[in-house]
């Protein structure tokens, strides 16, 4: 059935030409956008996931669309996109055109080997080509629409899209409507194939292989060829025409055979890799960005910034407020802005509705005036504060991008809706009287309104998927109709009506018949084409009505009841695809379920409910149970049960997803509680909502319809909605967790950048007479860096005020200790100290920084402080600061390409010293050094999970921090030119970027001039007004340094934060403050400004509020905050607003030197440490007299060190006095890997009492401990290594687990693992000491593994799990089949030795060699004979079913033969299955290999030939060995000639078997006669019903007895074994069969006799009556014997009357298939 579903969900692979011949098609492979990009709701995922439910009700014998190719899923929801199945294709012509090959290569993305090229007649028209193309296009028009609607390439709402490549120029103008399906062909990676690569014949090669290599590698490096072709250019540059292919508006590229000469000079684009050009910003696009008068970041945004009308701004502001500021996150997140951190999550919507107006103002500035965020934050404060600060403005900027994207997509979808509406109107107008078909749903204004009201990307996808469900298959028809009308209009317009019509007719004639629409066959379409829409509409509610019921939570719309039973109604819809009413109902339910699942209102309600109620359940995988220990990040949520997703915190869900990706956990998000006992009354969500689809009546008809509705609702939820909602919710939670991580990274960078440069004491600065030109005007810093490797030198770098390195110093022995043991080391250390002292004295730095590499930094900083103190005491040098600085940034800089380029000859540690000095000098500039195109900044450790967030998003967030801080501090352009070290800041200036910033510096360098005023940005640097407005206020000019070096007018305000637009107000304030007369001729506002700058306190008297009111009255707007800012700026120009530097506190020093954080080093953590010694408490004088004497030995014991071998008390005192007593041992000293010292008190060494720790641990030993206490000041930790603490069964030390932790599930898993461990640890055998080449001390599994590579018949002898007096001999019967033989030992000396005698069953052996030679090897030889037999079959290790299938198959092929096969049995090693099929049913028996030969039916055969010869003669004989039990399920058959009650046929059978072997047939006749049954030769033997057990495992259904239908036959006597099969009472009279003569008995001989295979003759011999006298005597004997047996039987408990049984062996013609009815029972002698 699934085959049919697949064939139904296919697309037609072949098309037919005019003559009806099949024209093979080139199948294009399309890969859709990723599932995040759009959840097209799994139209076909549904079909795949849900098809399993539909497999049973669609008939295979469908007559339409049989050759259609499986289209896979058109949804993005399937994680593993369904691959296209390979199908056999019949190709009538393999010689494809080059264009076809090109098309294949474009779509597959691989080169296709092309066959020999055949020259063809050139076609007059390209239209035929166009037509061929149309096949592949129509098929994917729905994808085209999706591409158009979501054309900006954005995935989930927050994801940034790749920049769309520039579209090629079109030669022909396209109609606007054509845009719906532009550029929708995608390659295997989902990228649009915008630029087809045409094969170009490269010159110089005729060899195909060489040319192919050249094409692959692109370059041939034959310089002679370059020379040869240089004049005319070695490559022909093809111009491409872009023509309208007239197939859904797709642009088709055709090479034009025109060539251009290229300039022979190589351009930059030929010399460098494109990636290098891109990273260096040298592409054409970069040049365009530089030239355009728009802020660089505006141009780089993936969604362009567009101007907006006031109405749209209002609408957008409201939307951004609701989504970004008023809607709380689903999970619990810290306040989104760390500037206001500490706010609880509930305060998310702290911004009131007044924010909306502020957002609108900000959007107006951004979209219409093109102001960047920092400009708005600094110069338009009145319009955004206090509601919005700078980070809120960035959020508005980001959400504006989302809004623009949503708006574009809505507009695209609206256009599509309008087109479909117009198309529907045309269709209906063509025949207005025709009623609408069931499958047609009119697209009305309600749908348009719903689209207009869409407020999120999720809702838009809902509307789009809803549209696809109802109108998806009409899209190609709509496009065709639109295309046809456009063509007609075009021709009419160009050539007039008459000519146009003629041409059109001619064109149609050339094109041939209309192409068949490529059909997408998904499950819904199949149901629709079968006309099930009508039945689906009779369920009583439309999806829209159900959605409204669901939204209002009451039955607003009553369910309409159709007046017929569902099954009765379904009969009208039965067809070839849905052959039964049940299948029809299943299909209708599928349609209803999918319609409900696609209804936007239903999805909106369910989405909201799902997010509120969703519960998270987590269980670990097998790997997770093993790997997630208490040190693992997933430990606290290893098991979770019903945790509401609303209670997830911060980045917790990201950790959960990571653990799931690593295969440690499985997560499940559901709307209902899972597995909670005692909550049975809680309704599931399904039970809550199904009532909205019910009709509350009790008639059978209504109940039946209610049942159908319930099943449809359940399917909609379980199969569609829950899965999709869980996925949506998971993506949202993951996005929130990632956003938290990005915010945490931003916060850390914010804290690093907010630190102001180091400032020495004011006195030091004033006394500094060393400020010459070389040193610069800033502070001088000496950076000291060292390596953690031993014996590496220490490097010092001196940096002047401008960040330039002026000197450096190498101290090779500075890391050695002053108190080192070796005198040589102490002397070298002293020399280095002296060298550093002189260096400090000469260079006089303001501060010394020491790298916080490890604990050694503490020693170095003490040494430096001591040197500084000595110099200060000697009044040789003012006191200078010594600071410890984190060297993480310095190490990153040390390894960067930038530092290598800047200090190529410096060793790495010296480069680190330079970075340390610069960092304390100005952290902002130093951090900017690692913001290169290599993205080095991401190597800094901001957050443990930073590598799991989207790199671009993290970079953008970090760059925002730089932009904020750089614009607050300002950038001195002239300093950046003079000192390239500070150039990195220019890219973050508002309005600029990496391209515009470097371009600005480049212009200034080319002009070899300094920037003397901000006006020059326009006049000299040609900056546009928009960029100038943005950046002018943040570029500062040091007007004081210009001094007399220039003749131009110096504007003092250029050195301040005052924006040029407000210079006049600043001057006015200065004039007013000084009370100058502005009307005077000699009034000089500039002079007033300079005076105010010297006496800023005069500004305090100004009434700025009145000034602001005056400005507002004059139309300048509200400027009161700006005026206060101007006053502050005039008081102190470009005052540094950063937090003053402070030395690191104790905790920061601890984290810096140990490289730990509170998350990685905490109380309760399990750690490993090395023992460094034993700690003792020195003895106190007053305790000397407490020595203890041992009365038994007479020796004295020291009360402290417990030494107990002192013969005299005086020796104990001497022991004290000499200082040789170490004192009382109080604990163990250890060292951790992070440099922290650990201490284990004696009582925490073990759960037992420990008096001497040195007996428990040794120095250098590694011990596992748990942290009890951390002392960050002393860098020490108290530890415990007691087993009870390490195990911590009571969870006193371990990290706390989640509130919803599932302890029960963990306990159950733990118990299961413990049981398994116990089972594995239990030794199944005792290791033995036995010298034999075949003996191995291994277990059962290891033996079988060893056997895999051994030969058939090889032996392994091993210990037995039965005990020490048993061995097991394992020998290889066949591949994968091994027999294990138990050997009993007797006469053992000990448990490990070999027994004197060995027994297998009742057979004795002297030693192992005898067992191998006399027992195993013969069996292996016999087995080999069977394995090599011509009728041997493997049958998957003796699989009965496989053997039966083989027999049935062979029997069908040769019905006149009786097939038989033998195969080794894996279930019973040592036995072989003998299968044969005389008639309709296969029969299977066992052949057992023994040392004597083959045992079959109780007889031993020494050869294979003898075995099969006997089998062929006796296969019809009954199988001996089964006696019926009294519990047999048998019934006494009804018979006219009833069986006498006093005869027990079972006993009779045993009696006959016990008779002498040489009894003649007359004797049997006499025995038969005494039963009182007359012979009735005409009676047909009973035909018993089929047995429910069957024979020998051959399956039920075999007849217990099968006899000939011939009425005149005579039964032949054989020993009777009554099988215990149940059967029905026969309808015919039954007579007891008589035993007739046999030439030789077929009764197997008794067990005591030597078995001799014998053959019997089946000749019918009619004995004359005259020979019966001998039989009478025997008859009397038999009768007497039977009477005795009967008497014994009567004494026993009365039994059921046994049934009479005809003889199983019926006399027949030899090898008659019809007469074979031997009941072959399994031989159970195992």
Curated annotation (Swiss-Prot):
<dbReference type="Pfam" id="PF22706">
    <property type="entry name" value="Tex_central_region"/>
</dbReference>
<dbReference type="InterPro" id="IPR028088">
    <property type="entry name" value="Spt6_HTH_DNA-bd_dom"/>
</dbReference>
<keyword id="KW-0539">Nucleus</keyword>
<dbReference type="GO" id="GO:0003723">
    <property type="term" value="F:RNA binding"/>
</dbReference>
<dbReference type="InterPro" id="IPR012340">
    <property type="entry name" value="NA-bd_OB-fold"/>
</dbReference>
<feature type="domain" description="SH2">
    <location>
        <begin position="1325"/>
        <end position="1431"/>
    </location>
</feature>
<comment type="subunit">
    <text>(Microbial infection) Interacts with human cytomegalovirus/HHV-5 protein UL69.</text>
</comment>
<keyword id="KW-0813">Transport</keyword>
<dbReference type="InterPro" id="IPR000980">
    <property type="entry name" value="SH2"/>
</dbReference>
<dbReference type="GO" id="GO:0001825">
    <property type="term" value="P:blastocyst formation"/>
</dbReference>
<dbReference type="GO" id="GO:0140673">
    <property type="term" value="P:transcription elongation-coupled chromatin remodeling"/>
</dbReference>
<feature type="modified residue" description="Phosphoserine">
    <location>
        <position position="125"/>
    </location>
</feature>
<feature type="modified residue" description="Phosphothreonine">
    <location>
        <position position="1530"/>
    </location>
</feature>
<feature type="region of interest" description="Disordered">
    <location>
        <begin position="1"/>
        <end position="199"/>
    </location>
</feature>
<comment type="function">
    <text>Histone H3-H4 chaperone that plays a key role in the regulation of transcription elongation and mRNA processing. Enhances the transcription elongation by RNA polymerase II (RNAPII) and is also required for the efficient activation of transcriptional elongation by the HIV-1 nuclear transcriptional activator, Tat. Besides chaperoning histones in transcription, acts to transport and splice mRNA by forming a complex with IWS1 and the C-terminal domain (CTD) of the RNAPII subunit RPB1 (POLR2A).</text>
</comment>
<feature type="region of interest" description="Interaction with histone H2B and H3">
    <location>
        <begin position="1633"/>
        <end position="1726"/>
    </location>
</feature>
<dbReference type="GO" id="GO:0051028">
    <property type="term" value="P:mRNA transport"/>
</dbReference>
<dbReference type="Pfam" id="PF14635">
    <property type="entry name" value="HHH_7"/>
</dbReference>
<feature type="modified residue" description="Phosphoserine">
    <location>
        <position position="73"/>
    </location>
</feature>
<feature type="compositionally biased region" description="Acidic residues">
    <location>
        <begin position="32"/>
        <end position="50"/>
    </location>
</feature>
<dbReference type="GO" id="GO:0008380">
    <property type="term" value="P:RNA splicing"/>
</dbReference>
<feature type="compositionally biased region" description="Acidic residues">
    <location>
        <begin position="95"/>
        <end position="105"/>
    </location>
</feature>
<feature type="modified residue" description="Phosphoserine">
    <location>
        <position position="267"/>
    </location>
</feature>
<feature type="region of interest" description="Interaction with IWS1">
    <location>
        <begin position="2"/>
        <end position="485"/>
    </location>
</feature>
<feature type="compositionally biased region" description="Acidic residues">
    <location>
        <begin position="59"/>
        <end position="80"/>
    </location>
</feature>
<feature type="region of interest" description="Interaction with KDM6A">
    <location>
        <begin position="317"/>
        <end position="1300"/>
    </location>
</feature>
<feature type="compositionally biased region" description="Basic residues">
    <location>
        <begin position="111"/>
        <end position="122"/>
    </location>
</feature>
<feature type="domain" description="S1 motif">
    <location>
        <begin position="1213"/>
        <end position="1282"/>
    </location>
</feature>
<dbReference type="Pfam" id="PF14641">
    <property type="entry name" value="HTH_44"/>
</dbReference>
<dbReference type="InterPro" id="IPR041692">
    <property type="entry name" value="HHH_9"/>
</dbReference>
<feature type="modified residue" description="Phosphoserine">
    <location>
        <position position="1535"/>
    </location>
</feature>
<feature type="modified residue" description="Phosphoserine">
    <location>
        <position position="91"/>
    </location>
</feature>
<feature type="modified residue" description="Phosphothreonine">
    <location>
        <position position="1697"/>
    </location>
</feature>
<feature type="modified residue" description="Phosphothreonine">
    <location>
        <position position="1539"/>
    </location>
</feature>
<feature type="modified residue" description="N-acetylserine">
    <location>
        <position position="2"/>
    </location>
</feature>
<feature type="modified residue" description="Phosphoserine">
    <location>
        <position position="12"/>
    </location>
</feature>
<dbReference type="InterPro" id="IPR035019">
    <property type="entry name" value="Spt6_SH2_N"/>
</dbReference>
<feature type="modified residue" description="Phosphoserine">
    <location>
        <position position="7"/>
    </location>
</feature>
<feature type="modified residue" description="Phosphoserine">
    <location>
        <position position="1526"/>
    </location>
</feature>
<dbReference type="Pfam" id="PF14639">
    <property type="entry name" value="YqgF"/>
</dbReference>
<dbReference type="InterPro" id="IPR023319">
    <property type="entry name" value="Tex-like_HTH_dom_sf"/>
</dbReference>
<feature type="modified residue" description="Phosphoserine">
    <location>
        <position position="1528"/>
    </location>
</feature>
């Amino acid at each position: 059935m699934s085959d049919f579903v697949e064939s139904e969900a296919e697309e037609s692979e072949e098309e037919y030409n005019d003559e009806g011949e099949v024209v093979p098609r080139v199948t294009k492979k399309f890969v859709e956008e990723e599932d995040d990009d759009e959840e097209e709701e799994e139209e076909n995922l549904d079909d795949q996931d849900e098809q399993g439910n539909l497999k049973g009700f669609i008939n295979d014998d469908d007559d339409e669309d049989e050759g259609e190719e499986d289209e896979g899923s058109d949804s993005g929801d399937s994680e593993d996109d369904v691959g296209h199945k390979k199908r056999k294709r019949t190709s009538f012509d393999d010689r494809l055109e080059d264009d076809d090959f090109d098309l294949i290569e474009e779509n597959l993305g691989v080169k296709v080997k092309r066959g020999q090229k055949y020259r063809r007649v050139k076609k007059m028209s390209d239209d035929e080509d166009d037509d061929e193309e149309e096949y592949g296009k129509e098929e994917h028009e729905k994808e085209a629409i999706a591409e158009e609607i979501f054309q900006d390439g954005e995935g989930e709402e927050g994801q940034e899209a790749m920049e769309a490549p520039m579209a090629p120029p079109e030669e022909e103008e396209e109609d606007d409507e054509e845009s719906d399906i532009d550029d929708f062909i995608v390659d295997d990676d989902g990228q649009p194939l915008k630029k087809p690569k045409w094969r170009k014949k490269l010159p110089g090669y005729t060899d195909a292989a060489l040319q192919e290599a050249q094409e692959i590698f692109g370059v041939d490096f034959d310089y002679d060829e370059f020379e040869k072709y240089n004049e005319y250019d070695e490559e022909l540059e093809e111009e491409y025409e872009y023509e309208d292919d007239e197939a859904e508006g797709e642009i088709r590229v055709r090479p034009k055979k025109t060539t251009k000469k290229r300039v022979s000079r190589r351009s930059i684009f030929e010399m460098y890799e494109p990636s290098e050009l891109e990273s260096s910003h040298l592409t054409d696009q970069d040049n365009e960005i530089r030239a355009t008068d728009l802020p660089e970041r505006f141009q780089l945004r993936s969604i362009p910034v567009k101007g907006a009308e006031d109405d749209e701004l209002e609408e957008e502001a409201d939307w951004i407020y609701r989504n970004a500021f008023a809607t709380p996150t689903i999970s619990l997140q810290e306040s989104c802005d760390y500037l206001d951190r500490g706010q609880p999550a509930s305060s998310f919507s702290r911004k009131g509705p007044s924010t909306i107006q502020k957002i609108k103002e900000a959007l107006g500035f951004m979209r219409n005036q093109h102001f960047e965020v920092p400009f708005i934050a600094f110069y338009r404060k009145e319009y955004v504060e206090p509601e919005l600060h700078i980070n809120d403005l960035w959020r508005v900027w980001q959400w504006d991008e989302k809004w623009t994207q949503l708006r574009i997509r809505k507009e695209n979808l609206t256009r599509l809706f309008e087109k479909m509406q117009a198309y529907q109107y045309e269709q209906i107008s063509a025949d207005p009287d025709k009623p609408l078909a069931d499958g047609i749903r009119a697209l009305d204004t309600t749908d348009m309104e719903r689209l207009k009201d869409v407020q999120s990307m999720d809702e838009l996808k809902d509307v789009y998927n809803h549209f696809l469900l109802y109108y998806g298959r009409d899209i190609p028809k709509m496009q065709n109709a639109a295309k046809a009308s456009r063509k007609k209009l075009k021709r009419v317009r160009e050539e007039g009506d008459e000519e146009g019509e003629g041409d059109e007719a001619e064109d149609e004639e050339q094109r041939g018949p209309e192409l068949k629409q490529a059909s997408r066959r998904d499950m819904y379409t199949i149901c629709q084409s079968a006309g099930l829409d009508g039945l689906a509409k009779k369920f009583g509610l439309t999806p829209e009505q159900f959605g409204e019921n669901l939204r209002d939570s009451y039955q607003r719309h009553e369910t309409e009841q159709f007046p017929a039973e569902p099954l009765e109604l379904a009969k009208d819809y039965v067809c070839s695809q849905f052959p039964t009413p049940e299948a029809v109902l299943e299909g209708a339910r599928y349609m209803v379920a999918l319609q409900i699942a696609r209804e936007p209102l239903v999805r909106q309600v369910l989405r909201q409910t799902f997010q509120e109620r969703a519960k998270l359940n987590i269980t670990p995988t097998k790997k997770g149970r093993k790997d997630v220990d208490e040190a693992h990040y997933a430990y606290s949520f290893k098991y979770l049960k019903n945790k509401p997703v609303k209670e997830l915190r911060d980045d917790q869900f990201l950790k959960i997803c990571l653990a799931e990706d690593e295969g440690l956990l499985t997560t499940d998000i559901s709307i209902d509680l899972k597995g909670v006992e005692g909550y049975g009354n809680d309704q599931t969500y399904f039970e809550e909502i199904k009532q909205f689809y019910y009709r509350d009546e009790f008639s059978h008809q209504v109940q039946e319809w209610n049942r159908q509705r319930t099943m449809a609702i359940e399917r909609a939820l379980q199969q569609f909605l829950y899965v999709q909602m869980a996925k949506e919710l998971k993506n949202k939670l993951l996005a929130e967790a990632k956003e938290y991580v990005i915010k945490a990274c931003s916060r850390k960078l914010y804290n690093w950048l907010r630190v102001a440069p180091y400032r020495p004491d004011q006195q030091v600065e004033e006394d500094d007479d060393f400020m010459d030109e070389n040193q610069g005007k800033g502070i001088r810093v000496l950076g000291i860096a060292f390596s953690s490797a031993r014996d590496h030198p220490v490097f010092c770098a001196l940096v002047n005020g401008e960040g330039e390195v002026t000197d450096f110093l190498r101290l090779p022995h500075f890391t050695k200790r002053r108190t080192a043991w070796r005198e040589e080391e102490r002397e070298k250390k002293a020399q280095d100290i002296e060298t550093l002292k002189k260096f400090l004295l000469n260079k006089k730095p303001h501060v010394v920084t020491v790298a916080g590499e490890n604990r050694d930094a503490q020693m170095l900083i003490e040494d430096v402080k001591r040197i500084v103190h000595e110099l200060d005491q000697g009044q040789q040098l003012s006191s200078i600061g010594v600071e410890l600085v984190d060297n993480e940034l310095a190490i990153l800089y040390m390894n960067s390409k930038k530092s290598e380029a800047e200090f190529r000859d410096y060793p790495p540690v010296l480069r680190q010293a330079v970075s340390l000095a610069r960092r304390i000098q100005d952290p902002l500039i130093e951090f900017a050094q690692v913001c290169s195109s290599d993205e080095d900044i991401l190597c800094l450790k901001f957050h443990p999970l930073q590598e799991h967030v989207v790199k671009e998003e993290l970079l953008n967030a970090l760059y925002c921090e730089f932009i904020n801080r750089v614009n607050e501090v300002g950038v001195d352009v002239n300093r950046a030119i003079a000192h390239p070290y500070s150039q990195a800041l220019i890219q973050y200036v508002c309005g600029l970027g990496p391209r515009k910033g470097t371009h600005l510096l480049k212009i200034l360098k080319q002009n070899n001039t300094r920037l003397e005023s901000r006006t020059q940005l326009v006049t000299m640097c040609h900056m546009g007004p928009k960029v100038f407005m943005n950046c002018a206020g943040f570029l500062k000019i040091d007007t004081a340094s210009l001094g007399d070096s220039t003749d131009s007018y110096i504007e003092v305000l250029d050195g301040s934060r005052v924006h040029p637009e407000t210079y006049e107000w600043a001057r006015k304030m200065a004039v007013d403050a000084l009370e100058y007369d502005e009307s005077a001729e000699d009034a000089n506002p500039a002079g007033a400004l300079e005076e105010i700058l010297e006496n800023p306190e005069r500004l305090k008297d100004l009434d700025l509020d009145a000034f602001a009111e005056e400005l507002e009255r004059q139309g300048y707007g509200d400027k009161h905050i700006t005026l206060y800012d101007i006053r502050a700026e005039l008081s102190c120009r470009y005052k540094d607003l950063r937090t003053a530097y402070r030395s690191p506190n104790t905790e920061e020093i601890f984290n810096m030197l140990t490289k730990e954080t509170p998350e990685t080093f905490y109380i309760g953590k399990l750690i490993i440490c090395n023992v460094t010694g034993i700690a003792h408490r020195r003895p106190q004088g007053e305790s000397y007299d407490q020595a203890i004497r041992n009365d038994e030995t007479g020796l004295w014991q020291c009360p402290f060190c417990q030494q107990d071998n002192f013969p005299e008390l005086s020796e104990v005192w001497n022991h004290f006095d000499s200082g040789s007593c170490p004192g009382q041992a109080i604990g163990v000293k250890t060292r951790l890997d992070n440099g922290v010292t650990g201490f284990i008190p004696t009582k925490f060494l073990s759960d037992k009492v420990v008096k001497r720790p040195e007996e428990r641990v040794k120095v250098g030993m590694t011990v596992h401990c748990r942290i009890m206490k951390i002392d960050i000041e002393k860098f020490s930790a108290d530890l415990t290594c007691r087993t009870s603490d390490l195990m911590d069964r009571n969870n006193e030390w371990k990290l706390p687990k989640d509130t919803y932790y599932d302890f029960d599930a963990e306990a159950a898993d733990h118990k299961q693992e413990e049981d398994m461990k116990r089972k594995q640890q239990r030794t199944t055998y005792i290791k033995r000491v036995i010298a034999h080449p075949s003996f191995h001390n291994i277990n059962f599994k290891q033996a079988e593994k060893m056997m895999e590579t051994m030969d058939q018949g090889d032996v392994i002898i091993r210990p037995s799990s039965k005990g020490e007096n048993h061995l097991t001999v394992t020998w290889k019967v066949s591949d994968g089949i091994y027999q294990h033989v138990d050997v009993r030992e007797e006469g053992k000396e000990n448990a490990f030795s070999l027994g004197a005698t060995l027994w297998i069953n009742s057979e004795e052996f002297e030693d192992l060699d005898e067992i191998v030679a006399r027992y195993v090897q013969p069996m292996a030889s016999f087995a080999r004979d069977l394995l090599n037999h011509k009728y041997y079959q493997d049958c998957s290790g003796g699989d009965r079913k496989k053997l039966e299938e083989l027999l049935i198959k062979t029997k069908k092929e040769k019905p006149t033969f009786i097939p038989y096969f033998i195969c080794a049995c894996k279930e019973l090693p040592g036995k072989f299955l003998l299968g044969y099929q005389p008639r309709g049913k296969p029969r299977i028996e066992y052949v057992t290999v023994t040392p004597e030969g083959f045992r079959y039916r109780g007889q031993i055969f020494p050869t294979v030939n003898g075995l099969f010869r006997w089998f062929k003669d006796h296969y019809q004989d009954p199988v001996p060995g089964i006696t019926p039990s009294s519990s047999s399920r048998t019934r006494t058959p009804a018979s006219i000639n009833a069986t006498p009650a006093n005869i027990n046929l079972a006993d009779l059978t045993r009696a006959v078997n016990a008779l002498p072997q040489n009894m003649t047939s007359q004797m049997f006749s006499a025995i038969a006669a005494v039963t009182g049954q007359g012979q009735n030769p005409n009676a047909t033997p009973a035909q018993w019903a089929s047995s429910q057990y069957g024979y020998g495992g051959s399956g039920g259904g075999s007849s217990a007895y099968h006899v000939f239908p011939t009425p005149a036959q005579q039964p032949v006597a054989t020993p009777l074994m009554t099988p215990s099969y149940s059967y029905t009472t026969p309808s015919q009279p039954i007579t007891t069969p008589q035993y007739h003569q046999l030439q030789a008995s077929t009764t197997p001989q008794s067990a005591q006799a030597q078995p001799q295979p014998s053959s019997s003759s089946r000749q019918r011999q009619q004995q004359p009556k005259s020979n019966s006298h001998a039989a009478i005597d025997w008859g009397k004997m038999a009768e007497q014997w039977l009477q005795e047996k009967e008497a014994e039987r009567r004494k026993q408990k009365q039994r059921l009357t046994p049934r009479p049984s005809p003889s199983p062996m019926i006399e027949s013609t030899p090898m008659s298939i019809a007469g074979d009815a031997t009941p072959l029972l399994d031989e159970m002698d195992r």
